[in-house]
Design a protein with these regions (language model features):
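Non-heme Fe(II)/2-oxoglutarate
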Residues: 145, 149-155, 185-187, 191-232
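Short, structured patches in soluble enzyme cores that scaffold and shape functional sites
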Residues: 93, 113, 125-129, 141
Length: 232
């Protein structure tokens, strides 16, 4: 908590987002520009909950600079207790729609834990104002060390948790909803129990920067331009 992007950086990323296509459901064959979202939904025959940008580090100078920012690298290194390696950026919209339950599950709008590596660390930055109803990030403080134990095998299994399960396992004050104006940033070990709320008011634009000890080439957003296709 307590990180804040300069307004100029927020604006730079927002300009990038307005000028480039994003891709529904993070699929390279489902591209559209923001003004064409309704046409893209019509082409898919469903609402679009999440749309991600690809190749952001190479196409957006602000994101490239942030990926090697010395303060972020220092924080990541302190947490990882080693020299951090930048392993990927992700920039995506979450829209206030009546989403399919399968899409809410697919796009991590149910409580869950990430197991991206044996040691990893993430920074998140809101590029839009996020208040209750705008798709805030929710996490459970300290749960990276003590996951819910409700079913046989929960110590090892990675699964989705219902809101009721999380409320039964953790004190209310540990369940934190993170809100703030555009530019608000926070760092998290997403092995903790967390989720993104489904917006009900305004779309949310979020930037994630991830660091680990090694780069296995699986967390980045790079796709060959020749593989990208537009829906609308």
């Amino acid at each position: 908590m307590g990180l804040q992007l300069p307004a100029s950086v927020v604006q730079e990323v927002r300009v990038f987002a307005q000028g480039h296509p994003c891709f529904a459901d993070r699929e390279p064959g489902r591209g559209f520009r923001l003004p064409a979202r309704e046409a893209a939904q019509a082409a898919l025959g469903k609402t679009i909950l999440v749309a991600q940008y690809f190749n952001t580090e190479s196409q957006c100078e602000a994101i490239r600079r942030l990926s090697c920012d010395p303060v972020l690298m220092w924080v990541a290194g302190r947490y990882l207790e080693s020299t951090p390696t930048f392993v990927g950026a992700n920039l995506w919209w979450t829209f206030p729609v009546d989403a399919l339950e399968s899409d809410r599950d697919r796009h991590a709008h149910l409580f869950h834990r990430d197991v991206d590596d044996f040691r990893f660390f993430k920074f998140f930055f809101y590029l839009t104002d996020v208040q209750p109803g705008d798709g805030a990030h929710v996490c459970v403080a300290g749960s990276h060390q003590r996951p819910p134990m409700l079913r046989p095998g929960d110590r090892w299994n990675i699964r989705r948790y219902s809101d009721d399960e999380v409320k039964r396992c953790f004190a209310t004050e540990r369940i934190m909803e993170i809100c703030g104006p555009a530019g608000t940033g926070f760092a998290e070990n997403t092995l903790c129990v967390h989720k993104g709320r489904t917006p009900t008011r305004e779309p949310r634009l979020l930037l994630q920067l991830q660091y680990a000890l090694f780069d296995y080439g699986v967390m980045h957003d790079r796709h060959p331009v020749s593989s990208l296709r537009m829906l609308a």
